[in-house]
């Protein structure tokens, strides 16, 4: 059995995930005690129009010492939800998956095990061993990975894999501008620029069984393209200024 980490903040973004939310929180409550001695679970409701907000509040009320809910009044975007989750986290290690249950909470143990390796990485990112997504999303992902490699030198295998683990200290002082799907890439680009080490580990990926995916919507893709080129042009114009743009990821801990 992998040695447990002392304290872990786990969060997930959720937009119209009423069919997945309760099951994911119950899965986390059952699984995280084997991964961390102390943990918290944060549900980030990104302006959902279904019962996601109400269910998140019910779960927080039922487990007040462990579960918290963060709400966006409107749908601000995937990156904005990740930023809110990172900002709400209180512990030294911070992990997230998506709210669609295409990753299992137990697989965070693969990431914590890698974090404890001799090279002591600052960040561990998962890569999907075999994607369980429609073909169009797989095509988008391959093109996106190639573009990030060419224009930013980002060599991570699976930039947008929603299974990541951070040492909180690695995020201190970082700012990310994108509030959309480009958030993860921008974060990894700025972590590398800050000299932080990133390790990778393969994780299983499971088919979505409830709810609807929004990652391939034209509006989401166009926003990511816009943010991609905005950062690239700013880095060419003034690298140091570009790296300082955006909103801070962390808030002072209470």
Task: Name these PLM-found stretches.
Residues 17-21, 48, 78:
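Donor nucleotide-sugar binding loop of glycosyltransferases
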Residues 39, 53-88:
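Conserved donor nucleotide-binding strand/loop of the catalytic core
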Residues 1-30:
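N-proximal low-complexity "stem/linker" segments adjacent to membrane-targeting elements
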Residues 45-54, 101:
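A conserved acidic beta->alpha catalytic loop
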Residues 24, 52, 82, 106-108, ...:
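Acidic donor-diphosphate engagement hotspot in glycosyltransferases and nucleotidyltransferases
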Residues 72-88, 93-96, 102-181, 208-224, ...:
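Acceptor/aglycone-binding surface of glycosyltransferases and processive sugar-polymer synthases
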Residues 6-8, 29-42, 51, 65-68:
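Short loop->beta transition adjacent to catalytic acidic/histidine clusters or analogous donor-positioning motifs
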